[in-house]
């Protein structure tokens, strides 16, 4: 998105589009499901549940963390990840509002 045009969109529109972009890969959706099911996970546990290399999983975790959907806390040599419930809830609200307007349901 061109920087000059970014001011033409609301903060919520920009936030939702960035989150949607982060969710636009099935591995990232799976990572969110893994974190939901396990509450917290270290990177190695997530890697064990995906058909991807550790470096690829790490890149997906970075993208999810960048938009705030997950939090990562360093514990010694490991990083422990969990869902950022505040952002997950606000994303749910943004999506519900958007689809309620679109389909008028």
Annotated model-derived regions:
Residues 1-16, 36-37, 85-105:
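Amphipathic alpha-helical dimerization/coiled-coil segments
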Residues 5-9, 19-20, 53-54, 71-72:
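Short amphipathic alpha-helical segments, especially helix-boundary/capping motifs
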Residues 14-55, 77-87:
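N-terminal helix-turn-helix DNA-binding core of bacterial DNA-binding proteins
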Residues 26, 64, 90, 94:
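Solvent-exposed, charged/polar functional surfaces in cytosolic regulatory/catalytic domains
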Residues 50-53, 63, 101:
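Juxtamembrane/interface motifs at transmembrane-helix termini
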Residues 60:
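Residues within the DNA-recognition helix of helix-turn-helix
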Residues 65-75, 82:
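Beta-hairpin "wing" of winged helix-turn-helix
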